[in-house]
Amino acid sequence: MTDQARTAAEPAAAPRVDPQQRRTVLVLVLAQVLSGAGLAAGITVGALLAADMLATTAYAGLPAALFTAGSAAAALVVGRLSQRWGRRAGLTSGYLTGAVGAAGVVVAAVLDDVVLLFVAFAVYGAGTATNLQARYAGADLASPRHRGRAVSTVLVATTVGAVAGPNLVGVMGDLAAGWGIPPLAGPFLLGGAAYAAAGVVLWVLLRPDPLLLARERAEQAALAPTAPASAAQTTATATLAPPPPVVEPTDRQVRRTVLLAGTIMVLTQGVMVAIMTMTPIHMEHHGHAVATAGFVIAVHVGMMYLPSPLSGWLTDRFGPVRVAVAAAATLLAAGLVSALVPPSSVVGLAVGLGLLGLGWSLGLVSGTALLTTSVPLEVRARTQGSVDLAVALAGAAGGLGSGFVVASSSYAALALGGGVLALLVLPVIAFAGRAPRRTSPAGTV
């Protein structure tokens, strides 16, 4: 099927202002606001809780690695569930699993059980995977020319909860202490409640299911009869020159495009998780309070999501490949700033982490739009889940490796290395653009 035919068969043929797309985005926005708090709560104190229970910082990156390892497995499962049963079933299952993981972290902290803690961290990662998978649901019914903005609208909704979460660390810690729970486990109480609420919202309100509706529309468009041309139209057409051939991507080009989209998101996630994970530890070692680290992480998470509308507009306006290059440059700048500012400078670290969040936003939105456009509906959710599996594994590697890099070298080395690593997307862009396209007569499918 050509890109033109696929576009015609997809929701682009629907009315310009699609009420079902508008409803879908509104429901997703509500769920993302809730789940954002769960997403950010564990990020801020996960490493600190593990360091406190293990009495060493050498494994401080392990919680992020376990979050993302669990996220990797959940991404695949949520993608498969969505492919078969729709987004509603897949996303709801993922959020409820994340809520169970949050409860497990709290129990492990109370019992001082490190093994249970690590298992719970992995289960908690399902919420992270689901939060990211929701962006695909926002694009299911969107027209191809507005997919970047649809993705970014869902992502930006996460900001409210994601920024509030880290800043509630102190409040939730005091609340937990009053209940006899270790203060560092307090944010996971918030995370569990937030994930559970998001799951309930999606199960109750995400009707009709956007992916199932998109498939139904595509099938109806494919079966719709073509109106016969009149005799006058036939005669007029016969006197015209044949239409120009349509240049469509070969299977190789489609595979390379999927590879490029995946690489953009893999590098973006790996670099972001590595630097973000060790920043609270770096700040604590230089005398900053936990609340101060929470502020820096709040800036970072805010910049991950608040610029999403800009990232979406840039992607729709200039194309995902150019925005991916901008993402790599921004991540490099983030690494340089984070490495070179004095450890005592809260403002400097906030700027570095803010740039890190912006680079992540540019990379994720551009990669998502590129992937969604290149994959047909019949295998879209499964392919998206597989790509998100690779993205989560990259985050796991970044989180796990970050602790060892800082322990054996320095935070500055980690930040610089991450910034340089982001530039690896450039040769992949060159490689993806080399595959030939096949030419077919206009109007063929």
Spans of features found by a protein language model:
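Pair of pore-lining "gating" transmembrane helices in MFS-fold secondary transporters
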Residues: 18-48, 122, 254-271, 354
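Hydrophobic core of transmembrane alpha-helices in multi-pass small-molecule transporters
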Residues: 33, 114-129, 348-362
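Intracellular juxtamembrane helix-capping segments at the cytosolic ends
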Residues: 46, 129-143, 362-375
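Helix-to-loop junctions at the C-terminal end of transmembrane segments
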Residues: 74-86, 173, 307-320, 406
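C-terminal ends and interior cores of transmembrane alpha-helices
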Residues: 96-111, 330-343
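Helix-loop-helix hairpin linking two adjacent transmembrane segments in secondary transporters
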Residues: 144, 153-204
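C-terminal membrane-cytosol helix-exit motif in multi-pass small-molecule transporters
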Residues: 169-170, 192-219, 428-432
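C-terminal transmembrane helical hairpin of 12-TM major facilitator-type secondary transporters
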Residues: 321-367
